[in-house]
Structure formats: C-alpha cells, structure tokens
UniProtKB/Swiss-Prot annotation:
InterPro entries linked to this entry: HMA_dom (IPR006121), HMA_dom_sf (IPR036163), SOD-like_Cu/Zn_dom_sf (IPR036423), SOD_Cu/Zn_/chaperone (IPR024134)
The encoding gene: CCS1
Cofactor-binding details, from the entry: Binds 2 copper ions per subunit.
Disulphide linkage map: 29-66
Location of the HMA domain: 8-71
Record's subcellular location: Cytoplasm
Amino acids binding Cu cation 1: 19, 22
GO BP: superoxide metabolic process
Keyword Cytoplasm applies: yes
Name of the protein: Superoxide dismutase 1 copper chaperone
Protein's organism: Kluyveromyces lactis (strain ATCC 8585 / CBS 2359 / DSM 70799 / NBRC 1267 / NRRL Y-1140 / WM37) (Yeast)
Length: 245
C-alpha cells in the first residue's frame, strides 16, 4: 500500500461475496480504477473497505462492468459525509424525476470532494454545478437562493444513458474549500446556464437538499426498519428511481 495523503479517505461497500475466489475477482474488477490504494474484505458480512481517493461512483461502475453490484455503506470519518439527490422541478415528460446524485466527503481541513453523477437528462451538453444558500425547494431550484460556491469544471453530459431512452448522462469528481457542516441543509443545483442562473425559462436546472450521510462503519443495517426490505431489495427500488450510486 502507498502512503496516505490529504486526498485519501475510506469508504465501505456492501458487495456480495462467498469466498476468497470472490475477493480475487473483485480485486481484478478494481485494478484499473485510479486512486485506489488499499482494499480489504469482510467475507462474513459482505463488506469491502477501500482506501484512497477514487470516486465512489467509479468503484460502483467497475463492479457493474464485471457483473457485480455494490452499495456504498459509508464514506469518510463521522460527520464528514453528505449526499444530495437531484430532482428536476419542471413541467413536461421529465417532471419531478431524479436526475442524479451527489456524494460528498470531507478529506482534510477545508477540502471536500464532490462525486457528481447525472443520468436521464434530456438535453446533451455541459452542465454547471453550485451549492446554493438555501435548501428551500418550494419553487424548485428558483427558491434556493444565491450560489455560495460555484464549481468551475462543467459536467459533460453527452454520453447516452444506458438506462433511460433518449437521454444522456455524465459525471464529475471535484473538490471545494468548504466543510461538510457548512453545507448541510443547503441545496446542490445543476444547470445548463454557465453563469449558474436558475431563473431562465429556457435553461434546464435540477437540484436537491444536502443531507448528512453515514461515515465509514456507521451504517451496518441489513434490513430497513421502515420498509422491512433487505439491503438489496432497497437497492433495486433505488435503481428504479434512477438512484444508482
């Protein structure tokens, strides 16, 4: 294992495995993912721990390409992780549908990674992300206030979606000099407008409230107390709602 640096964090994933042969196969699946420094397995509990600075979505995609599925169970230290489910608040065939997910993890003082994944957007092109002052979505993204942080790197959404016909997908793994605690309760917004203006009727925008998520080893439930469904049953439901990571 290489030495750690300030960009590294740990993440745990639920991955079905039965023996050492399974773990060897998973290692092969992940060998081309940039940023992985160490991988360990708990076969009994079907858990994989990854250390490094690889985007969690890149790890999930690598497993998918090998015919396996993975569920993120926790990232980073306690109180250092967050998530935002991005919905579209417009009229038409794409009304109020999930368009993506952002996983957020703080790795160092004033350094936080954002793993942004979009899927099912109807217009191909570049999309621009920002953190907004408010988490008020009563009027969709128009009521989220001014940006408190704008990401310079756009998200290229020109790849055809592999799950939603006639739509496109894209991803970006970026960092910002912010703390996770500063973001909780605010909103994450993505728009086609390069000036991050969400009030133009001819632009496409979507967003979601930023909420805390589990840190590493903080989420060990196997059955949801609310629905009674297993972890993998919940996973299938999430995918049906376009929540893939």
């Amino acid at each position: 294992m290489s030495g750690t640096d300030e960009n590294d964090f740990e993440a745990t994933y639920a991955v079905e495995m039965h023996c050492e042969s399974c773990t060897n196969d998973i290692q092969k699946c992940l060998k081309d993912v940039n940023g992985i420094k160490n991988v360990t397995f708990d076969i009994k509990d079907n858990l994989m721990n990854v250390e490094g600075h690889a985007a969690p979505s890149a790890i999930i995609n690598a497993l998918k390409n090998c015919g396996r599925d993975g569920i993120i169970r926790g990232t980073g230290k306690p109180n250092s992780a967050a998530v935002s489910i991005l919905g579209q608040y417009t009229t038409g065939p794409f009304e109020n549908t999930v368009k993506g997910l952002v996983r957020i993890v703080e790795v160092a003082q004033k350094k936080t990674f954002f793993d942004i994944n979009l899927n099912g957007v109807e217009k191909p092109g570049l999309y621009y992300a920002s953190v907004r002052a408010s988490g008020d979505l009563s009027e969709g993204v128009k009521s989220t206030g001014d940006p408190i942080y704008k990401f310079d790197q756009p998200i290229d959404c020109t790849s055809p979606s592999d799950s939603i016909p006639n739509s496109f997908s894209g991803s970006s793994f970026v960092s910002a000099p912010v703390h996770v605690w500063e973001l909780i309760g605010r909103s994450f917004v993505v728009t086609t407008d390069p000036e991050h203006n969400v009030n133009k009727d001819n632009d496409i925008s979507f967003g979601g409230v930023i909420a805390r998520s589990a840190g590493i080893w903080e989420n060990d439930k196997e059955v949801c107390a609310c629905s009674g469904k297993t972890l993998w049953q919940e996973r299938k439901d999430a995918i049906q709602h376009n929540i893939r990571f």
